[in-house]
Amino acid sequence: MKKLGFTRSSRRCSQPQEREQESERSRRRLRRRLSEGLLLLVALTVSGGLAAVLTPTPQVAVADEDSSALLRTGKQLFDTSCVSCHGANLQGVPDHGPSLIGVGEAAVYFQVSTGRMPAMRGEAQVARKDPIFNESQIDAIGAYIQANGGGPTVARNPDGSVAMQSLRGTDLGRGGDLFRLNCASCHNFTGKGGALSSGKYAPDLGPANEQQILTAMLTGPQNMPKFADRQLSFEAKKDIIGYVRTVIEERQPGGYSLGGFGPAPEGMAIWIIGMVTAIGLALWIGARA
């Protein structure tokens, strides 16, 4: 009986302890769950913040009203003047016109501002003539081609206007060396142009402005090769432009250049002047005798 009473009293004493231990375990489990939830919340917050900071902003092209109007105008001009030869999707038309995909607004500026496009007829080489589009129309067509086909762009001033005077490099000696190395074999050392094979020719650079010379080097129109930045850097192109415009515009220190075509016309002029002088002198001597 005593043992039984002792056992019952022990059980009664142990029950509060068990309840207290169970309560402590419950509190520990609750604290663990709260701490785990808090850590998870902190981790999600930090990872979300890092993702927001480090993820690059998507490059979404959003055209404003002005650019949209420019593209609409360009498409209208293209559809009325260019689509019959170059195709509705710029893919080109066999035996009529090449693809315009990848030529960029630089090619549009050169071809249209020099009057070569639209072409009046098919021939070995399209000659320069007065342009039929004004500057704003050329910009619109160029913007449409650039938006749909991509390619080299026109160099512009900070205000968005087409760059001209700023394209003239200052190292004219370097520009002259580069011109003689890369261009003079076709365009003559003074930029007067020259004949090529199959009815083709290198045109006179005299009427070309700075932007037209640059875009010609970027796009390689007709028989001209392209000059990528790996061949001629942008600064090298500017020096060539500066040299060409200086040679064309400045007075020749040697006197009248006879068109700048080189020794052939100069030799012919010397021969004619010499023969006329000799004949005149002979007649004068004969008359005195």
Curated annotation (Swiss-Prot):
Cite the post-translational modification comment: Binds 2 heme c groups covalently per subunit.
Q: Which domain of life is it from?
A: Bacteria
- Domain (Cytochrome c) spans 69-149, 170-248
Its membrane topology: Multi-pass membrane protein
Compartments, record wording: Cell membrane
GO function terms (MF aspect) = heme binding; iron ion binding; ubiquinol-cytochrome-c reductase activity
Tell me a GO cellular component. plasma membrane
Span-the-membrane segments of this chain are: 37-55, 267-287
Q: Where is the composition biased (Basic residues)?
A: 1-11
What keywords are annotated for this sequence in UniProt?
Answer: Cell membrane, Electron transport, Heme, Iron, Membrane, Metal-binding, Repeat, Respiratory chain, Translocase, Transmembrane, Transmembrane helix, Transport
| Ligand binding (heme c 1) | C82, C85, H86
Residue segments, region Disordered = 1-28
Instruction: Give the catalytic activity.
Output: a quinol + 2 Fe(III)-[cytochrome c](out) = a quinone + 2 Fe(II)-[cytochrome c](out) + 2 H(+)(out)
Enumerate the residues binding heme c 2: C183, C186, H187
Write down the EC number.
7.1.1.8
How does this chain assemble? The cytochrome bc1 complex is composed of a cytochrome b (QcrB), the Rieske iron-sulfur protein (QcrA) and a diheme cytochrome c (QcrC) subunit.
> What is the stated purpose of this protein?
Cytochrome b subunit of the cytochrome bc1 complex, an essential component of the respiratory electron transport chain required for ATP synthesis. The bc1 complex catalyzes the oxidation of ubiquinol and the reduction of cytochrome c in the respiratory chain. The bc1 complex operates through a Q-cycle mechanism that couples electron transfer to generation of the proton gradient that drives ATP synthesis.
Q: What is this protein called?
A: Cytochrome bc1 complex cytochrome c subunit
Gene that encodes it: qcrC
